[in-house]
Structures are given as structure tokens and as C-alpha cells.
Amino acid sequence: MNKKIRVRYAPSPTGLLHIGNARTALFNYLFARHHGGDFIIRIEDTDRERHVEDGERSQLENLRWLGMDWDESPETHENYRQSERLPLYQKYIDQLLAEGKAYYSYKTPEELEADHAKQEAAGIPPHYINEYAGMSDDEKAAYIAERKAQNIEPVVRISVDEKAIYKWNDIVKGEIEFEGGNIGGDWVIQKRDGYPTYNFAVVVDDHDMQISHVIRGDDHIANTPKQLVVYDALGWEAPQFGHMTLIINSETGKKLSKRDTNTLQFIEDYRKKGYMSDAIFNFIALLGWNPGGEKEIFSREELIELFDENRLSKSPAAFDQKKLDWMDNEYIKNADFAKVFELTKPFLLAANRFDERAQELVKLYQPQMKSADEVVELTDLFYGDFPELTDEAREMLAAETTPLALSTFRAKLAELPESDFTVENIFPLFKATQKETGVKGKMLWMPIRIAASGSMHGPELPETIALLGKEKVLAHLDAALNK
């Protein structure tokens, strides 16, 4: 690539960072870092009605948590918010008006709605009907004077050549083209309140910031021909466009929707649950891109080195919560204990479980945790009531050999002094019980696990027994034997 690579992530401060937007930011980040280019953050805040207080800070904070850094942003550069760039937009709107490539439109919202209703009834795609069509200069002047007298604020529309073909070679999807007659007619570039529309402002910004590549979701494909109209009108070279496929829910096969409350979709949600940022970074990087091969766990450095825009998928990317949980578990169990302990600390404190056993319990359950907040549920056995047994667990306890195995193991545990109730001393008791009773394998350790912990699954059994303590374990075994 001969041109300096400059890409941008341009969020609107309208809420929390969504998985889909995080992917857009991440792919732009990987693309820039792989090619030694610039990654730019720009805030698109022209939609004042949807503006959320603190939305910008939240976006940047969550991007940082994911591990992204950037070269330019509103934090370091002036006029990187659209609301700060209004004079620049006005300059180019005035230029287009002066050149006859744009014009004031006085049609009211009610008139536009009536036009669209007629078009819909006739089976015609909605498009703007030029209000000046067929008017003489005098008629046009009279029409404008009448509208001004009624205090109707105009919008500014850009003229679209309906016979033109707007096409580009998409980085992801290949050749795409639109006929000028299929993009809705002359469209608004400046609203009644004086603010530019998205499709106009984004072109001015991308040109002004020398953006070389625009990588975004394929919901923006329909915006691209409109933006090309502006590039043509102003005589500017357009950047290369790439439109990533949508993200679908792996269970429903439908587009991931913010209304789907059964799926966590905001980065903030994963932060609050104690997911590891490295895992989320890794997972999102594979939503619609794959370096090839079977490997799925990659460091940030590996992802930057391997990233290839030519391997962006043309098929929808499946968001699989179970896959994400598996990946986070891989990161947690392989992370330094100190890091995992720090991650679990807020949850232990909130549950009033940050006591002398906290470190040992986190160490015990680190291999099992899919997110740090699970530490509370996993440690319930040590602080709450004995769990309700499943039917399968009850069936195992009802086995013919269970009473002998449990009573023998209990007797051996009872002989251990409190000071010797350690993993090193508990571990040999399983073999001793097997030797004495002839009960072995699953028929030995599974009933003991169920009786001691109330579960058929869990961390290493000797460690669990040692941490539960002699008194509690003996009480649990007695309860099982007396049923």
C-alpha cells in the first residue's frame, strides 16, 4: 500500500460500547497497527437528540480496557468532535450552494410524509420529489418567498444524478454498485437546525483527516453511494471502503439485536462480570476474521502480526456466548494468580467473603471460573447451606458400595488432628480407603465428592476437603450416611 494508512473509529456518544462497535474499532485498530498506520478516534455527536451524558468517556474507557490505544483523538487534538467542526461543514455546504450542486428545500415533514405514503401505495420505493420541478424562475422565487413568510426553515439538499453509477471495490465484498436513481433522490446534507447530516459530515471529516480506508459494518453499505455523491460534488478522492458482515446470534441465527436481553452485548457488562480484557479482545478479533488453522487463542501482538484484511469473512459472524465463556476460562486458568485474585476481589468483598480463606479458595476455583463473578457461586459451599443434590447425585449415593466407602473414609479423616488436616495428609486416605474396602475409581471418589461438597463436579477433592475443614466435612459425611 503506497498511501499512508489512516483509519478511524467514529462512535456516537449515544450509549455504551456494543460488541458490534467494539469489533469495528478492533478491526480498524488491527489494520492500522499491522500496516504501521494511524488509528484515529473521532466523535460523531451531531445527533443531539440521542446524545448521552458521559457517553464519550464511556466509549473511550471501554476501548482502553480492551487494550486499544490510538494516535489521535479528542483528548489530544482539537476539533475531533463533529460539534466542534460546524464552521468547516458550513464552508463546504456554502461551496456546493454557490456551485449549484446543492439547494435549499422548503418541503415540510408533513408534505414529505404524504409524498412517501403515495409512493408506498403505488409500490414505488420512497424518494424525494424535487419541489422545484417544472417551475419557472419567477414561480420558484414566489414559492420560496411564500415559504419564508410562513417561517418554514429550509434544509439543504445535494443534487443527485439519477443516471450516474456509484461503485467501489469493497475490501470485503468486492465490486458493489448503485444506480443514482436508487438512493432516494436528492438527500439532505444540512438539517433545519443547521447541523450537517451524518452522510455529509463523515465525508468532510474523512477527507480533512486524510482517512485512507473506511472499515465498518455492512449496515453502512447503503450510505456509501450517498457519500460518493459528496466526494464527486466536491472533487475529492474517496477512501477505500470495506464492509464487515453482520454479527448473528449463534442460537437463533438472527442478527444480534440490542433488544435481545438474553445475551450480554455491551463491553461494560463483561467488565462488570469480571471477564478478562485479553479474552474479549481475542474473541472479538475472531468475529468475522480468521488467520487460518485450528488455533484460537492469540495474544494482542500475534493478532496484530497476523491480521490480513483479505481474510475478512463474507459470511455472517456468529456470536457464541458459550465460546466466549470457554475462551475466558482459558485465559483465567492460565493467568497469573495475582491477576485473577485481583479480578475476583470486588466480588468477594461484595459477598462479604474476603477473609483468611479467600486466596486459597480463588486458587482452588481458578481453573473452573468462566468469569470472575462466578467466584461467589463457586464458593457458596464454604459459606452457605449444603446444596440440593441432583437426582443423578442421589442415585450415586444410593449405590451398594457407598456406605462402606463413606464410613471408612470418614473414620480415617476423623483420626487426623486439626493441625494435620492438610491436602498432603488427606490425599493418601483415598488410597488407604480403596485398599481396605476394595471400592475404587469412580465408585470411591464420586460418592465422597458428593457427600462432602454436594456436587458431582468441582476442583481437586483433597483441596476442597482441606479448605472445608474437618468439622464441616465430617458433618457432611455423617449427613450422607444417615440418609
Swiss-Prot record:
<comment type="function">
    <text>Catalyzes the attachment of glutamate to tRNA(Glu) in a two-step reaction: glutamate is first activated by ATP to form Glu-AMP and then transferred to the acceptor end of tRNA(Glu).</text>
</comment>
<dbReference type="InterPro" id="IPR020751">
    <property type="entry name" value="aa-tRNA-synth_I_codon-bd_sub2"/>
</dbReference>
<keyword id="KW-0648">Protein biosynthesis</keyword>
<dbReference type="InterPro" id="IPR049940">
    <property type="entry name" value="GluQ/Sye"/>
</dbReference>
<dbReference type="InterPro" id="IPR004527">
    <property type="entry name" value="Glu-tRNA-ligase_bac/mito"/>
</dbReference>
<dbReference type="InterPro" id="IPR000924">
    <property type="entry name" value="Glu/Gln-tRNA-synth"/>
</dbReference>
<dbReference type="GO" id="GO:0005524">
    <property type="term" value="F:ATP binding"/>
</dbReference>
<dbReference type="InterPro" id="IPR014729">
    <property type="entry name" value="Rossmann-like_a/b/a_fold"/>
</dbReference>
<dbReference type="GO" id="GO:0000049">
    <property type="term" value="F:tRNA binding"/>
</dbReference>
<dbReference type="GO" id="GO:0005829">
    <property type="term" value="C:cytosol"/>
</dbReference>
<keyword id="KW-0030">Aminoacyl-tRNA synthetase</keyword>
<dbReference type="Pfam" id="PF00749">
    <property type="entry name" value="tRNA-synt_1c"/>
</dbReference>
<feature type="short sequence motif" description="'HIGH' region">
    <location>
        <begin position="11"/>
        <end position="21"/>
    </location>
</feature>
<dbReference type="InterPro" id="IPR045462">
    <property type="entry name" value="aa-tRNA-synth_I_cd-bd"/>
</dbReference>
<keyword id="KW-0963">Cytoplasm</keyword>
<protein>
    <recommendedName>
        <fullName>Glutamate--tRNA ligase</fullName>
        <ecNumber>6.1.1.17</ecNumber>
    </recommendedName>
</protein>
<comment type="subunit">
    <text>Monomer.</text>
</comment>
<dbReference type="GO" id="GO:0004818">
    <property type="term" value="F:glutamate-tRNA ligase activity"/>
</dbReference>
<feature type="binding site">
    <location>
        <position position="258"/>
    </location>
    <ligand>
        <name>ATP</name>
    </ligand>
</feature>
<dbReference type="InterPro" id="IPR001412">
    <property type="entry name" value="aa-tRNA-synth_I_CS"/>
</dbReference>
<comment type="similarity">
    <text>Belongs to the class-I aminoacyl-tRNA synthetase family. Glutamate--tRNA ligase type 1 subfamily.</text>
</comment>
<dbReference type="GO" id="GO:0006424">
    <property type="term" value="P:glutamyl-tRNA aminoacylation"/>
</dbReference>
<keyword id="KW-0067">ATP-binding</keyword>
<dbReference type="GO" id="GO:0008270">
    <property type="term" value="F:zinc ion binding"/>
</dbReference>
<dbReference type="InterPro" id="IPR033910">
    <property type="entry name" value="GluRS_core"/>
</dbReference>
<feature type="short sequence motif" description="'KMSKS' region">
    <location>
        <begin position="255"/>
        <end position="259"/>
    </location>
</feature>
<dbReference type="Pfam" id="PF19269">
    <property type="entry name" value="Anticodon_2"/>
</dbReference>
<dbReference type="InterPro" id="IPR020058">
    <property type="entry name" value="Glu/Gln-tRNA-synth_Ib_cat-dom"/>
</dbReference>
<keyword id="KW-0547">Nucleotide-binding</keyword>
<keyword id="KW-0436">Ligase</keyword>
<dbReference type="InterPro" id="IPR008925">
    <property type="entry name" value="aa_tRNA-synth_I_cd-bd_sf"/>
</dbReference>
